[in-house]
Amino acid sequence: MNMKTAVLTLTGFEIQETPIPIINDNELLIKTLACGVCSGDLFVYQNRADFVATYNRLGHEASGEVIEVGRNVTAVKPGDIITALALPAYADYFVASAEGVVKLPQVINPTYALGEAVACCVHAANRFGTKPGDKLAIVGCGFMGLICMQLAKYQGASFICAIDPVVERREMSQRLGADVAYNPFETKSDAILAEHGEFDIVIEAAGVQSAVDLCTDLVAQHGRIILVGYHQSNNGLRTVNMERWNFKAIDVINGHVRRQNEKVAAMRQGMMLMQQGHITTEPLVTVYDFDEIEHAFRDLTRGTPGLFKAVLQMEKK
C-alpha cells in the first residue's frame, strides 16, 4: 500500500506516492496527525540544491496515532496518541522507535504538541540554572526563544527583557510574560544596561553573530549565556570577544541536545508542563494543510509577519 509523502525537489516540495513503511519488532507505525516545520528543515529547503540527492524527505516534529506496534513494544498500543522523535514525518505515516515516543495527555491537541521542539527548549531550560529573583534577557523571540522565555518565567525569573527586531515578536513576548521588549536596532545595549543593569542569565535564541555579541554585552559578571539558537549561516562560523568573556568570568552553555534518552525525558517533561498550563505553543502556531507544504515553506522564507511556527496538519482544516 502507498501513502502521500512530501518529497523535496530542486523546484520545491512535491506530494508523491511512496510505500507505507514496514516496522520491525521494536518500532511503531504511526498515522501522522501533525508535524511542525523546524528551522533546520527550512535551511535544507532554502539550500535544496545541496541536499535533494541525499536528503529529500523531512519532518521531525511529529504527533500522531499509533496504528501498529512491533511484537516487543509494550508501553503503547494501537489507538494511543503520541508525540515522537522520528524522521521523515512529512507523510501520511511515519515510523518511530518504542523508546522515542511519549503519550499525549488528552488535554493536549496533537497539532500543538510539537514534542521534539518543546523538548529542545526544556532541555536548554534545565541548564539555565534559573533561581527565583534572577534577571533574564532573551535575545531572539521566535518559537524557541518564546518557549524558553516561558520556561524561565516558570522557573522563577523575576524580570524578563525580550529583544527582537520584529514588532510582532516583541508584542508576543509581552503577551507571554516579558516585562519589557526592545528592538536591538533602535535601542542599543548601552541603553538597555542603563535602564535595567546587567542580566544574570542571557539566552541567545537567534542563531546570528549579532545576537552573540549582544549577549556578551548584557550578561553580568559570573552570569550565564545559554546558546539555544541554531547557527547555520556562514557555515556556523562565529567570532567572540574572549577577553570580555574571560573578564566577566561567565559560563557559556550549549543548550542543544543530541542524546535520544535525554531528549525523550525532556519531551515527557515538556508535555507535563504544557498539561499543567505552564507553557503554551498555541498562540505561536499557524496551521497549514499538508498539501500546502510548499506554501508554508515559502511563507517562512519570506518571513511572513506573525508566523512563528508552521505546523502541517494532515486532515483538512
What is each PLM-predicted segment?
Residues S210-M272, Q276-H278, M314-K317:
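Glycine-rich phosphate-binding loop and adjacent beta-alpha segment
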Residues A86-E99:
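A structural motif shared across PLP-dependent enzymes of the aminotransferase-like
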Residues T187-G197:
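Short amphipathic alpha-helix with an adjacent loop that forms part of the alpha/beta core around
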Residues T111-E186:
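Mid-domain Rossmann-like dinucleotide-binding core that forms the NAD(H)/NADP(H) cofactor-binding site
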Residues P21-C35, R48-P88, P105:
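Glycine-rich beta-strand-centered segment in the early N-terminal region that forms part
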Residues M1, D213, N261, A265-K317:
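C-terminal hydrophobic helical "lid"/dimerization subdomain
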Residues M1-L58, E315-K317:
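Short N-terminal strand-loop motif that marks the start
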